[in-house]
Regions:
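Mobile-element integrase/transposase regions
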Residues: 1-28, 34-37, 48-57, 61-66, ...
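C-terminal, beta-rich DNA-binding module of retroviral/retroelements integrases
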Residues: 12, 143-223
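A generic secondary-structure signal for well-formed alpha-helical elements
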Residues: 33, 59-63, 89-92, 113, ...
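A conserved active-site cap/scaffold subdomain adjacent to cofactor or substrate pockets
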Residues: 124-155
Length: 223
């Protein structure tokens, strides 16, 4: 199984400080052979964490793929993505720079999403949860269960049916192994009070470690 992923710039929602409108971003993971969307979600920030979160949720639902294929965006080409794929036994590939045809399948899906964004604009969602709720309904009713022009001899097969008809066994892993694969690690120096600073907070390590450098291992989805 080969998965693609991409980030699409979404609408502005009043979710910033004091209701200021803030742009949100859609991350999707799509099965190459069937065009089935394994997971898609709008997020409030544009960073590597949103890709990792979406990837983890896709894996939890559908197991691990043999290969993932990404563009060269900085949210994908990170040491943590490399570590995750290595830990889970996933082959990690990147598209050649300046070759949009290599990510054409998911780019075509992103153009289909434009129809959803037009519909969502009429609903005027005020929260990220509401936007994601609308997206999931649209995904089920207007994409996953609709005939896809690239599937089947008569172009009458939907991504949902194509994926469910693929009898290749899904590979599920223990939840602890998945959690471990997505952990991050950063070095911090212990100050004179025996504390370290991390993610805007102070944590006591102990006087015995003053001047030492310690590794902070953490789950970015649980900060």
């Amino acid at each position: 199984r080969l998965w693609h992923s991409d980030i699409k710039y979404g609408p502005y929602l009043p979710i910033g400080v004091n209701g200021i409108k803030q742009q949100v971003y859609l991350v999707t993971f799509v099965d190459d052979a069937t065009r089935f969307v394994l997971h898609g979600e709008f997020y409030p920030t544009l960073d590597q964490i949103i890709v990792e979160d979406c990837f983890r949720k896709a894996i939890q639902k559908y197991g691990v793929p043999e290969t993932v294929y990404f563009d060269n965006g900085k949210q994908y080409r990170t040491k943590w993505m490399g570590r995750t794929c290595s830990k889970l036994g996933i082959r990690l590939l990147f598209a050649k720079p300046y070759s949009p045809e290599s990510t054409g399948k998911i780019e075509r899906f992103n153009r289909v999403v434009d129809a959803f964004l037009s519909e969502a604009a009429l609903e005027k969602p005020q929260t990220l949860d509401k936007l994601n709720e609308l997206f999931n309904v649209w995904l089920d009713e207007c994409y996953l269960n609709k005939p896809h022009s690239a599937l089947g001899d008569n172009n009458k097969v939907s991504p949902e049916n194509a994926y469910r008809s693929d009898h290749k066994a899904l590979k599920f892993l223990d939840s602890d192994r998945i959690t471990n694969a997505f952990l991050h690690c950063e070095a911090r120096k212990v100050d004179k009070a025996g504390c370290i600073s991390f993610d805007g907070h102070k944590y006591e390590v102990g006087i015995a470690f003053v001047g030492s450098t310690v590794d902070v291992v953490y789950d970015p989805a649980d900060l």
